[in-house]
A protein has these predicted regions:
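Hydrophobic/aromatic-rich alpha-helical bundle segments in the mid-to-C-terminal region
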Residues: 84-92, 110-157, 168-182, 190-196, ...
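Hydrophobic, amphipathic alpha-helical faces that serve as interaction scaffolds
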Residues: 71, 80-81
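Conserved hydrophobic/aromatic "anchor" residues
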Residues: 19, 64, 71-72
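C-terminal alpha-helix
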Residues: 105, 160-168
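Alpha-helical structural segments
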Residues: 7, 24-44, 52, 56-63, ...
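Solvent-exposed, amphipathic alpha-helical segments
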Residues: 36-47, 130-137
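Helix-turn-helix
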Residues: 1-24, 28
């Protein structure tokens, strides 16, 4: 707690007036992270159609990760990395609510005939894993692109995956909406998509 207090620029006694232990501080950090994450995701409800709401949810996911990369890492860290045997129940409930929100976006796209019928939970897991993998690669410096270049990769790749899960009526349009295989590099030039991955350490 003393080290944490120094990093925050306050005294240890001042910190103890608000938190009993560093475990309680961590709990509060994760709780706040979930609330910020939720605010980003729930802007999707402003969408006018199931597809708009689904895509806005994806944008909210990306927006949170780019705005709060450290909190993003904390939210998806293994419990033992945070010093927990299990996730506290209130935090688990927050995580489940966000997972259900994502499932609901997929379910309403299925009901609207945009995505092929199937298990909303399984399809949501596929789409989430794709989004999370791309974001994690970028945040860890494994993609040779700037932020705007990554936004393009994220959106185009998302559309390609979505097209493969869509009904025949919507799949072709989603495929056409995805951009070409070139994106902006950090130096402002272009690099073929098959050379985006940074293999060096």
């Amino acid at each position: 707690m003393r080290k944490l207090a120094r990093n925050l620029g306050v005294t240890a006694p001042a910190l103890y007036r608000h938190f009993e232990s560093k475990e309680q501080v961590l709990h509060e950090v994760v709780r706040e992270a979930y609330e910020r994450f939720a605010r980003h995701l729930y802007t999707a409800l402003e969408g006018q159609t199931p597809l708009e709401r689904f895509e806005l949810a994806g944008e909210g996911y990306l927006g949170f990760a780019l705005a709060h990369p450290r909190l993003f890492e904390v939210l998806f860290a293994a419990p033992d990395h945070l010093g927990w045997d299990t996730v506290p129940r209130d935090l688990e409930a927050q995580a489940c609510a966000l997972g259900q929100f994502w499932n609901d976006r997929v379910r309403e796209c299925m009901d609207a005939g945009i995505l092929r019928k199937g298990s909303p939970e399984d399809t949501a897991m596929t789409l989430w894993s794709h989004a999370h993998g791309l974001v994690t690669l970028f945040l860890r410096g494994r993609l040779r692109v700037d932020v705007e270049g990554f936004r393009q990769i994220y959106r185009d790749s998302h559309r390609r995956l979505l097209a493969g899960l869509a009904t025949a009526e919507h799949g072709e349009q989603l495929s056409e909406d995805a951009a070409g295989p070139r994106t902006t590099r950090n130096d402002g030039g272009f690099v073929p998509s098959d050379h985006l991955y940074r293999t060096g350490t």
